């Protein structure tokens, strides 16, 4: 389980630390910090280019989520993670920031906090790329403890609190990024073929375009019963009637039916229509959409799912007529 009721003592300790910060005049959620660099950019520039123990004069200011803390007396080590999972080590030394600041660091910083570090880029004695801090600040004080990063979350937590899954599982974060890449790729391909993107009504007086049970609502202004759309088809076809010869929409649809791992009550649908086309032309378009999306997201026509299943979308696709399929 995860949440305040599951870890009351940890939450209370974090709330107390936030109170300490406020009493000391330290903002637990500062409006601005001098973040001049990203963890990804520092990694890209220096990773593998410094010898163990080598120091540079390059100053950086970066922030990330605290995933690891180690207290070694006059020196503390912290691991910061960027949103994409890129990590970097921070080193906070009494010699560099002073005894009072180091004491405050040990008192206030917890796993899950977002931490700002400003300092020099170095390689530790073990060769780990690090930021040797001259300044530090809590960018956002976390009141909830992190989930156990080495354990799988239960399905209920993953479903009801997807943000927890994103923290715990890099694959889930990557899925969100890949979805964004896929949608952008679809739009580029449609645009290359002169399709116009439109947004059609979500609230409709008639639920058509598919056979599904709709969600219902009521518009008070017109005293009118309405449906959340189950498909955009009817309004897209009206665009064709109006003279838009190639039209598409990427948007949400709603169906008040069964829910399982592959069916959600609200979901994104891609739908397109083309005047003067044939089933051959739309088939070629679908193939191109899938192949280009695979390349843009994975860099290959071969796609491996999380369960290990592999699909190869490359080359020519086999075709079969509707008559032969029956």
Regions found by a protein language model. Name each.
Residues 1-326:
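Class II aminoacyl-tRNA synthetase catalytic cores and aaRS-like
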């Amino acid at each position: 389980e995860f949440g305040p009721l599951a870890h009351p003592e940890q939450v209370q300790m974090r709330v107390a630390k936030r109170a300490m910060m406020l009493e000391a005049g330290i903002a637990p959620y500062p409006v601005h910090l001098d973040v001049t660099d990203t963890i990804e950019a520092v990694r890209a520039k220096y990773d593998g280019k410094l010898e163990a123990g080598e120091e540079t004069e390059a100053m950086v200011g970066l922030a990330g989520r605290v995933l690891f803390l180690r207290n070694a007396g006059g020196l503390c080590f912290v691991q910061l993670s960027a949103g994409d999972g890129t990590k970097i080590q921070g080193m906070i030394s009494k010699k560099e920031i002073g005894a009072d600041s180091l004491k405050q660091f040990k008192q206030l910083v917890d796993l899950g906090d977002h931490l700002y570090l400003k300092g020099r880029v170095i390689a530790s004695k073990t060769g780990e790329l690090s930021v040797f801090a001259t300044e530090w600040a809590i960018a956002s004080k976390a009141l909830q403890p992190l989930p156990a990063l080495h354990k799988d979350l239960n399905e209920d937590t993953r479903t009801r609190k997807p943000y927890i899954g994103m923290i715990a599982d890099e694959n889930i974060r990557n899925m969100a990024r890949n979805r964004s890449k896929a949608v952008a790729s679809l739009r580029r391909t449609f645009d290359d073929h002169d399709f116009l993107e439109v947004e059609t009504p979500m609230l409709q007086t008639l639920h058509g375009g598919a056979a599904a049970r709709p969600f219902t609502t009521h518009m008070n202004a017109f005293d009118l019963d309405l449906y959340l759309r189950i498909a955009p088809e009817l309004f897209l076809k009206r665009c064709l009637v109006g003279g838009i010869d190639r039209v598409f929409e990427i948007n949400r649809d709603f169906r008040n039916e069964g829910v399982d791992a592959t069916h959600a009550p609200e979901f994104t649908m891609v739908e397109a229509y083309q005047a003067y086309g044939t089933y051959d032309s739309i088939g070629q378009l679908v193939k191109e959409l899938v192949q280009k999306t695979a390349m843009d997201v994975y860099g290959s026509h071969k796609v491996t799912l999380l369960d290990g299943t592999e699909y190869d979308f490359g080359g020519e696709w086999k075709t079969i007529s509707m008559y032969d399929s029956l």
